Amino acid sequence: MRAKRMVVGLLAAVATAFAGLTGSATAAPDHTDVDPLIVGGVNATQVYSFMVSLQNTSGGHFCGGSLIKSNWVVTAKHCVQGKTPASVRARIGTTNRTSGGSYVAAAAIHLNPTRDIALVRLAAAVPQAPIKVAAASGPVGTATRLLGWGQTCPSPGGCGAPVILQQLDTSIVADGLCSGIFGAQEICTNNPGGTRGACYGDSGGPEIKMVAGAWQLIGATSRSGGGSICAVKPSIYVDVPVFRPWISGIAGPV
């Protein structure tokens, strides 16, 4: 997966927490359908034009995503599996998931047949600048940043989702630190201090790295790398650059 290339709801079996965090998140109080959020992060220090909040028709956030073209969003498959385009809305390019940016309906959903990645085609192009998909995720030690509106406390359903986007600086770690990872197609990402990382509500959201002064997309939040309590273990992200051929075959070159 690179030189060593690095949820929306509880799964019935706690062991694979985060990884189905989209459809099951309805159990969380006060934020129906919310996926992992970032535990131990801080309020976003800038507006990320490409940041997407996937929402139901009532405006409830359930997953994150990344704008990769003016009318295409990449997210986790478990976020949109079983959903119809008519049931999905996207708020794009704001740090507040309830206001600002562009608010657009989904027109089509494409699920990858084997891994936890999906594409959402928007009903209309938006003016926000998309993020470039990186050439590769990078080796162990690559500095990255996570973004999301997921739960900010580690226990499932223990708190609501923040209104303001959260960010967390972290790094790629060895695949062996993530249980159940598909190393050639996924990224194992550190949980700094053993207490900070993605949580319920963050699923589908971006893992990004800085390249020549600009953010590039390397990952989409997928699941925990071990355990149902958020941030106590490294977490797993789909390696988006690996799926460039699949993405380009549907959305056009990226």
What are these language model-derived features?
Residues 49-70, 101:
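A conserved glycine-rich beta-strand in the N-terminal activation segment of trypsin-fold
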Residues 54-55, 73-76, 81-112:
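Conserved H-D interstitial segment of serine endopeptidase catalytic domains
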Residues 58, 78-82, 93-98, 123-127, ...:
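Acidic glycine-/aspartate-rich tracts in secreted/extracellular proteins
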